Regions:
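Cofactor-/ligand-binding subdomain signature composed of acidic, glycine-rich
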Residues: 1-29, 144, 149-152, 159-167, ...
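Phosphate-moiety recognition in structured ligand-binding domains
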Residues: 2-8, 128, 250-251, 256-262, ...
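Short, flexible loop segments at the rims of nucleotide/cofactor-binding pockets, characterized by
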Residues: 10-17, 58-62, 87, 176-183, ...
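A short, well-structured juxtamembrane/interface segment
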Residues: 13-31, 179-196
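Anionic-ligand anchoring segments at beta-strand to alpha-helix junctions in alpha/beta enzyme folds, i.e.
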Residues: 21-79, 194-245, 299-302
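Glycine-rich phosphate-binding loops that contact phosphosugars or nucleotide phosphates
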Residues: 27-178, 246-283
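Internal, active-site/partner-interface "lid" segment
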Residues: 139, 158-192, 314-348
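Short, hydrophobic/amphipathic alpha-helical patches that form generic packing surfaces
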Residues: 153-161, 217, 221, 291-306
Length: 349
């Protein structure tokens, strides 16, 4: 995993990057709400930004670009907007950037990693004369079909944006034991024992949600299997029934920080002994706990791909879906046609 993620290079770059302007945007006036959005592999990055903004005393939420672009201009004026995109050229994020710059230019910011000619978001900010395009030139980040290095870089940069004194050097090397696999009765398992899993339940608490959301995307985009992302409370509220009904072909992944130790122990008390568990744990109770969980969950993903013969670099496409056609679905054109969400009852489409 260390070679795949190139952790030493990513952490060195993240520690050397100048995130001063990004920090000022995210930590100044925390009383203003923040709406963060990310396209593709950056969705979990927006989730992490919102989590950190909340931990810093502000109110924040992460939404998809489609949802953001469903909001009215008046709605977009009520909050800071953070648009996350590695390349800055997907139509949805470009559309969101142009709208934000038109109606809320003083509080619309972009956070991209690529500064080349295809970065249309960066061009839009330059044309508008905005200084809130937070691009970090010279970063060397490589992804294939599935984003692997980009989320790690983003998480590291956000950790530094909110905590300039944070030490990321310990993440230069992969943990020796990034996760534990076992049945709920303590019987040790290995990745091959999860080959027949057809669905996962991901349970998270405080720092775990961004990493859980990221792993869900990896599993689905690689064609491995779907996963349901829940916090521990929602699982205990009734969704444990799925585990009870699918012991033969499901597993539970627990994202654990020091805050969830007791909750995890109590949750395990009611699970059947044969329940397959993936325990992804961090000893950190700070922003980099999410980074730690992201790295550890990535290790599980790569190992699961290895035992199932899944090519995450270029996943199989047995249904032969033309990969260009999903990109051609006219989401933004339809949003322009139908207009923003409204409570008015007299509208017809």
């Amino acid at each position: 995993m260390e070679n795949i993620l190139n952790l030493r290079s990513l952490m060195n770059q993240a520690m050397e990057a100048d995130v001063t302007a990004l920090r000022q945007f995210l930590t100044t006036n925390p009383g203003q709400p923040l709406v963060a959005t990310g396209s593709g592999g950056a969705e979990s990055v927006a989730d992490f930004a919102a989590l950190l903004y909340g931990a810093n005393g502000g109110l924040a939420t992460a939404v998809s670009p489609y949802t953001l672009n469903s909001f009215s201009d008046d709605t977009l004026k009520t909050a800071k907007l953070l648009l996350v995109s590695k390349g800055g050229h997907n139509n949805d994020i470009v559309f969101a950037a142009k709208r934000g710059l038109a109606v809320n230019p003083a509080r619309t910011a972009s956070f991209t990693l690529y500064t080349g000619d295809r970065n249309e978001v960066r061009k839009a900010f330059a044309k508008a004369g905005s200084t809130l395009s937070f691009d970090i030139p010279g970063l060397r980040v490589h992804d294939d079909f599935i984003s692997t290095q980009t989320p790690v870089m983003y998480f590291a940069l956000l950790c530094r944006a909110f905590d300039p004194d944070i030490d990321l050097s310990k993440y230069r090397t992969a943990p020796a034991a990034p996760y534990r696999l076992e049945r709920n009765d303590g019987t040790a398992l290995d990745p091959a024992d999860f080959k027949d899993v057809r669905s996962f339940i991901f349970l998270h608490g405080s720092w775990g949600r961004p990493a859980a959301a990221n792993l869900e995307g990896k599993l689905v985009e690689s064609g491995l299997c779907p996963a349901c992302v829940l916090d521990f409370r929602n699982y205990c509220h009734g969704r444990f029934i799925f585990t009870s009904a699918h012991l033969e072909d499901s597993a539970v992944v627990m994202f654990v920080s020091p805050r969830e130790k007791d909750i995890v122990a109590r949750t395990r008390k009611f699970l059947p002994a044969s329940t397959r568990l993936v325990l992804i744990e961090t000893e950190t109770d700070a922003p980099d706990a999410s980074l730690d969980l992201l790295i550890r969950s990535s290790a599980f993903f790569f190992d699961l791909c290895a035992v199932t013969g899944t090519n995450w670099v270029s996943p199989k496409n047995p249904g032969k879906i033309d990969k260009r056609q999903p990109m051609w679905v006219p989401f933004m054109a339809e949003l322009k046609r139908s207009g923003p969400l409204t409570l008015r009852k007299d509208r017809t489409l």
